[in-house]
Amino acid sequence: MGDDYQSIYRFSGCNLNVFLNFKDYYDKAKILYLNNTYRNSKEIINIAGKFIMKNNNQIKKELNSFTSINKPLKFVYYKSIKKDLTKLIMEVKSKGSVLILSRNNFDINKYLDFNVFQIDREGNIYLNNEFIKVRFLTVHKAKGLEADNVILINLINSLYGFPNKLEDERIFKYVNNYKDNIRYEEERRLFYVALTRTKNNIYFYLDKSNISIFVKEIKRENKKYIECIKK
């Protein structure tokens, strides 16, 4: 069982060709599709589905949801990177469990005010030594998980932003013969995973002067699903 949309471990040698050409490897196999999702709203499915299909090498799927949310994309433009995130966490945690997701392990150090919060090795976040149902994880670690609401941080256009612009190590051309036909295919799948961790809303925590190309694309193509919030 697997999902080519969530194939995000090429750095460890995983090959998307196994999904794309499954019957070439197992000619007697029967492929069954799971078409219903019980986590995401119809709107998130539509947004994420349109986003991932910009990749050339993905299997087109029709997914169904039984819930609807009017504007699940919350664009939060901050003035103070740490203070405004503190405010946002306190607001969102009152609505249920929260995942704070980012592209890189070290991103949280720039964003979280450690004078207010504490964080353990598992990414659990504490306020006054009390767990507040908020976790910080990289998107890779969050695969398979869910929360009532998700906050995405470090959505900037830079080498270590999202998408991450580091080039693959040369060794991968020897261990993995699959080639991306457009730039950032794996990063796009990773962003898809981030978008689909939420049961309700996604909060994009944004620096108005430096915004990820993925976020710009989401904004351009999904304006009716977006609520803008200025801190």
Regions found by a protein language model. Give the residues of each.
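Conserved RecA-like helicase ATPase core segment
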Residues: M1-K71, E167, V215, I226
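Short glycine-/polar-rich loops that comprise or flank the Walker A/P-loop
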Residues: D3-Y5, Y26-I31, N70-P72, I132-V134, ...
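Conserved nucleotide-binding/hydrolysis micro-motifs of P-loop NTPases
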Residues: D4-I8, G13-L16, T37-S41, N105-D107, ...
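Inter-lobe coupling/hinge region of RecA-like P-loop helicase motors
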Residues: K28-N36, N57-R103, V134
